[in-house]
Amino acid sequence: MSDDKKLIDDSPIPDTPVIPAQLQVDAVIQVRCHKDIDCFNACCKNIDIMLTPYDIIRLKKRLGITSTEFLRLYTEPFEFGRNSVGGVKYKPKEGTNECQFVTEEGCSVYEDRPTACRYYPVGLLSTRRQDENFDRASYALVTEDHCHGHFEDRKLTIDEYREEQGLIDYDELGRGWRQLILKVKSAGPAIGNMSKTSLKFFFMAC
């Protein structure tokens, strides 16, 4: 099995639509999202969005509430991976899988939207070798039937796409959190599954 395929297979999301190939920042992709596209808002109707600590800070400031209030109203804890790594993700509108911030005009918190929303339909893949103390970033293309942005007549590099979507600061400020996730995951079965108390502390760190 190739390293690319193994990395995709290890994804916490089953049946992932990610194309199993690691791309670098100079890779050229074809994608464009805009209000006039026929799939506008489709990606916001079936969400599974993990949030970083920086995402939470941006959003709670945007909404004018505390972190505690934001976590209670807009998120839910979850575990992923073989070692039950903890995290928080968007809580959809009750009875649906739709984002609480989506409107007919688009995202109501667009300027402060989370990292995952900015990247879509590109995925950030962070890896860390056992003999290294830093993470390596690569990227993958996400192809889902509802997204027609891949058919738009525009090509750009992943680095250009990241800059366009305001991801440079998000990636830099989220690096410590990604390294923490990788460290917990790389500990493997030596630490066993995280206890309920450990998960609570992990959520607090997030």
Identify the function of each model-found stretch.
Residues 1-42, 48-206:
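Short loop/turn segments that flank or connect secondary-structure elements
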